Amino acid sequence: LIALSLAACFALPLQAKIVTDVEGNKIELPDNVQRVADLWHANNQIVLLLGGANKLVGTTTSIAANPWYSEVYPNIKNVPVLTNGETIQTEELLSHKPDAVLLSKKSMLTEVEQAGLKGVRVSFQDFDGLKKTVRITAEVLGDKAPEIAENYIKELEGNIQFVESRLKGLKDE
């Protein structure tokens, strides 16, 4: 009985968490994600905002070439460029062993999953979508990212309310 109990303990998987992406897909990730490839240029800034820059193991051509990004995060020059936004360098992506791959395109998600990696779709076209993507990215990153995300969203909502209050009563001409 003791041997059976010990065997069961060793058979348990490492701690995991379930993250739900923008389409409602549930993805099982390690509880403590350490390596993230962010293959959507618009989301790389969110990773920085949430304090996850040190977890980046892959980025996009447009981010690597962006002078602003290099100014804010000089180490981006050392992060491998794994996509031009259309195609993924799958073999190189695999070599960097990401715990999670953030991306926006369904076709890329399929490619990542076929390679045996954990893909998490993020995407937004409006403020509600932005807030959802910030929360998803924070959940993937873990650590203090969820707290940072909620503070950012609170500030964003406050700014939106401020602008709406200033525009209230204005008429289209």
Provide a role label for each language-model segment.
Residues 2-11:
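Bacterial N-terminal signal peptides
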Residues 12-16:
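Bacterial Sec-dependent signal peptides at the C-terminal "C-region" and cleavage site
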Residues 17-19, 26, 109-173:
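Extracytoplasmic substrate-binding proteins
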Residues 37-96, 100, 105:
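A short, structured surface patch at a secondary-structure boundary
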Residues 28-30:
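Core beta-strand elements of the Rossmann-like FAD/NAD(P) dinucleotide-binding domain
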Residues 21-26, 41-43:
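Short polar catalytic/cofactor-binding loops
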Residues 1-2, 140:
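N-terminal export leaders
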Residues 33-37, 55, 118, 173:
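Residues that mark the start of a beta-strand
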